[in-house]
C-alpha cells in the first residue's frame, strides 16, 4: 500500500486505524522520509543514544525554542534525524521511526501537541530504536512491542518507584504535583498527563500545568 510498504521495519505509534488512516500514514511517512534527507547526522550509535536518555529527559523542563536545537544535536550525534510534521487528519498518528539511508528517522506530529504527549511519543519511538525493533524487516505495529515501547516511555519519564510512592500520598493536589515533578526533574504537565491517563484525576483538572507545543515543521 503506497510508499509505506517500501519502508522496511517502520515502527509507529497511533491510536486507531482504518483504511483512510493507513493512506494518511503512508503520506506522512513519505514526507518524513524526504525531509530527513536534508539532515546530516553522525553514524548510528545505539550505545550513545542509551547514554544520553537522561539528557533528553531533562529537556522536558525547557520550551521548544530552547530544547529543539539541543534535541536535534543530541539525536544527530547518535545517528538519528528527527523531523517534526503537522498532524494529518484521519491518521491517528503520533510518531514513526524507520531507517533511511545511513541514519535513523524519527518523525513526530507536533502542531498543537501537549507536552506530555510529545515526550511520551518521543521516548516511545526511542524505545523502538534501542530495542532494535526497526532493524527487523518484518516489524510494523506488533502489539507486544508497541506495549513495551509504551512502558519504556512511561517509566523513563516517571520512574516506577517514584511514581508508586507518589500515588500513595495526597497526589491529587496541584501543589503535590508541582513538588513531585520538581523532585524527579520533569515538567509538571507530564505528571498531570499520567494521573489523568490512569484516572487518578479528571481530565478537566490542571490544564494550566499542561503546556501546548507549537513547533515549526
Question: Regions from the language model: what does each represent?
Answer:
Residues 1-217:
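Active-site hotspot residues in diverse enzymes, especially metal/ion-binding acidic/histidine motifs
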